[in-house]
């Protein structure tokens, strides 16, 4: 096995809740950097000039951070739960979780906030795990609609929650920096599962807390 083959790894084999992904062979870092140089030249610049000479390396390192969610495992994040909750049986909610993602159509960033609530059935998960769950799905190429469903699916499936509510409010740079060039337009997506879908009073409680 040569060095290039050894450097390649398979990605996409973790929990990909809400996605139909087959494991793919990840190119080497050198191959990824070469692809960035090609795009720089296609844009009309010289990838060998002083200001761009290190850009391919920086872009590849940025991709590692922006798309780290492909290596995250939602099931693992939600696997450790606590049952000693002193009989707590009401809504658990996290408000204003940062969302930093990229759309799958133009790879343009979309930035916003997420609100998550669930109704536990005897066990709860650490609050930081829910924020981490959002980060795992956000750091993948996808649509906001898909991400909203992925988060709801994961909480419903792995926590056996009686109900789940997810709302994401984000601004898409594919709308503001290209195409129609509309600024200050936000997209809101929601998912309600279980009692949050059937109990309109509970659903309204969630929405009121979002607005608070």
UniProtKB/Swiss-Prot annotation:
It comes from the Bacteria. GO terms for molecular function: GTP binding; GTP cyclohydrolase I activity; zinc ion binding. It is an enzyme of class 3 (hydrolase). Its EC number is 3.5.4.16. It holds the Pfam family GTP_cyclohydroI. It catalyses: GTP + H2O = 7,8-dihydroneopterin 3'-triphosphate + formate + H(+). One of its GO terms (biological process) is one-carbon metabolic process. GO terms for cellular component: cytoplasm. InterPro entries: GTP-CH-I_C/QueF, GTP-CH-I_N, GTP_CycHdrlase_I, GTP_CycHdrlase_I_CS, GTP_CycHdrlase_I_dom. Keywords: GTP-binding, Hydrolase, Metal-binding, Nucleotide-binding, One-carbon metabolism, Zinc. SUPFAM superfamilies: Tetrahydrobiopterin biosynthesis enzymes-like. PANTHER family: GTP CYCLOHYDROLASE 1, GTP CYCLOHYDROLASE I. Toroid-shaped homodecamer, composed of two pentamers of five dimers. Belongs to the GTP cyclohydrolase I family. This is GTP cyclohydrolase 1. It comes from Caulobacter vibrioides (strain ATCC 19089 / CIP 103742 / CB 15). The lineage of its organism: Bacteria, Pseudomonadati, Pseudomonadota, Alphaproteobacteria, Caulobacterales.
């Amino acid at each position: 096995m040569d060095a290039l083959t050894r450097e390649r790894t398979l990605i996409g084999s973790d929990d990909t809740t809400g996605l139909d992904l087959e494991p793919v062979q990840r190119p080497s870092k050198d191959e990824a950097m070469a692809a960035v140089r090609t795009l720089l030249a296609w844009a009309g610049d010289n990838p060998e000039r002083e200001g761009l000479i290190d850009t391919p390396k920086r872009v590849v390192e940025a991709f590692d951070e922006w798309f780290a969610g492909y290596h995250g495992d939602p099931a693992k994040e939600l696997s450790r739960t606590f049952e000693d909750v002193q009989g707590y049986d009401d809504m658990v909610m996290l408000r204003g979780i940062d969302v930093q993602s990229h759309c799958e159509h133009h790879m343009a960033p979309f930035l916003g906030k997420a609100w998550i609530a669930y109704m536990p059935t005897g066990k709860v998960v650490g609050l930081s795990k829910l924020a981490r769950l959002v980060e795992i799905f956000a750091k993948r190429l996808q649509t906001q609609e898909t991400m909203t469903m992925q988060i709801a699916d994961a909480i419903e499936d792995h926590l056996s929650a009686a109900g789940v509510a997810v709302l994401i409010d984000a601004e898409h740079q594919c709308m503001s920096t290209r195409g129609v060039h509309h600024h200050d337009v936000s997209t809101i997506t929601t998912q309600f599962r279980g009692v949050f879908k059937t109990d309109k009073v509970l659903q309204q409680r969630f929405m009121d807390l979002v607005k608070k």
